[in-house]
């Protein structure tokens, strides 16, 4: 069967076509992503209204290109999967309404996909990773460790109680006067800096809870930058390097605990003679090489296989949405048109609220 996937949850507009067979294997036939980076660069961050308007302007063309590149006609599509949350509500509305319109016009099933589930299952698409596995999802909007038991069964072990890691990277980069997008710019600056020059906190390090926190680190960076003002290029590089070192230390500590939790539930002795369990990283921040190397080392220490999907599939894309939709469709799941997009949509909605959920409910 062939599925069309649509993704408009933030500042990438994407459409893709995949082919999914009865054995459960999938092939990406097309995967088109249009980035809005240039639209948002003058503002130093994503502007929701601009993002939504950009989705409206380009989505139809991207869907057509995805179908053309896949040598597929709309009538040959078996189902339409679309990100329905979490994300920016304006962008989600564009994608969901487009998918519903196509579904209504063609009679093809409509499938609402959780954006986080798309990230969670990407390693199954790219590496055929076996269940269960541990996922670290790090992006501009999310920082979570998730125990992926099987399709549809996700246990969130820890989440950020304030800023997501990608958000912390971008805001720190902006504070240092680095260009947007901030994550890659800060990583580049850090290569030239002294990571030991500035003492920065490692939030929650050593605590038994599995959550993350980055707002205090961001505040410490601001205080250091203010004390050193005006900043030279060397100052910026040293602050960037010190910040990145603090982040990697924090990630190491948090994921180390999550791996211990995993092996308590699924002892490594069960994997003797089999492929070891996997530590998977996904999300835009997975492009950071310092974090990747830290996770690779950590996985090796714990006897895990380290898996990082290609960067094009770590960041937001529609192939992962089509694949997640295929899993649901293969199990007979589809949605009615009365489903609405959700700005917040945790993978484990039935779980007890975590610390830091805020007045608006559990962080997605």
Swiss-Prot record:
Subcellular location: Cytoplasm
Catalytic activity, reaction form: L-threonylcarbamoyladenylate + adenosine(37) in tRNA = N(6)-L-threonylcarbamoyladenosine(37) in tRNA + AMP + H(+)
Binding of substrate, residues: 137-141, 170, 183, 288
Chief subcellular location: cytoplasm
GO cellular component, one term: cytoplasm
Annotated Gene3D superfamilies: 3.30.420.40
Disulfide-linked positions: none
InterPro entries reported for this sequence: ATPase_NBD, Gcp-like_dom, KAE1/TsaD, TsaD
Gene Ontology MF terms: iron ion binding; N(6)-L-threonylcarbamoyladenine synthase activity
Comment on bound cofactor: Binds 1 Fe(2+) ion per subunit.
Keywords: Acyltransferase, Cytoplasm, Iron, Metal-binding, Transferase, tRNA processing
GO biological process: tRNA threonylcarbamoyladenosine modification
Named cofactor requirement(s): Fe(2+)
Enzyme nomenclature, EC number: 2.3.1.234
Residues engaged in binding Fe cation: 115, 119, 316
CDD domains per the UniProt record, alphabetical: ASKHA_NBD_TsaD_bac
Annotated family: Belongs to the KAE1 / TsaD family.
Function: Required for the formation of a threonylcarbamoyl group on adenosine at position 37 (t(6)A37) in tRNAs that read codons beginning with adenine. Is involved in the transfer of the threonylcarbamoyl moiety of threonylcarbamoyl-AMP (TC-AMP) to the N6 group of A37, together with TsaE and TsaB. TsaD likely plays a direct catalytic role in this reaction.
NCBIfam families in the record: gcp_kae1, T6A_TsaD_YgjD
Protein name: tRNA N6-adenosine threonylcarbamoyltransferase
Gene behind this protein: tsaD
